[in-house]
Amino acid sequence: MKTTILLVILGLTLLFALSAATELKDEERDCKGFQVKCKKDSECCSSYVCGSQWKWCVYPSPFGR
């Protein structure tokens, strides 16, 4: 009986953690991912920049702009 209650509480905690992680992921969907057309850096997700030549969201150059 005690084990069953403990497993139910553990399951509910796991569901709560997964739903919170899903909500955080939804907030980031407004940004554009890798090789998607962009006009400025703010449109791209945090790990990308808007490339100056082709205007795609790409990884930033290690050598600067």
Swiss-Prot record:
Disulfide bonds: 31-45, 38-50, 44-57
Entry comment, domain topic: The presence of a 'disulfide through disulfide knot' structurally defines this protein as a knottin.
One GO MF term attached to the UniProt entry: toxin activity
Source organism (scientific name): Chilobrachys guangxiensis (Chinese earth tiger tarantula)
Gene Ontology CC terms: extracellular region
Tissue distribution: Expressed by the venom gland.
Propeptide: 22-29
Family: Belongs to the neurotoxin 10 (Hwtx-1) family. 32 (Jztx-16) subfamily.
Signal sequence segment: 1-21
Function: Probable ion channel inhibitor.
InterPro entries: Huwentoxin-1, Huwentoxin_CS1
PROSITE patterns: HWTX_1 (PS60021)
Primary location recorded for the protein, binned into one broad class: secreted
Protein name, entry field: U11-theraphotoxin-Cg1a
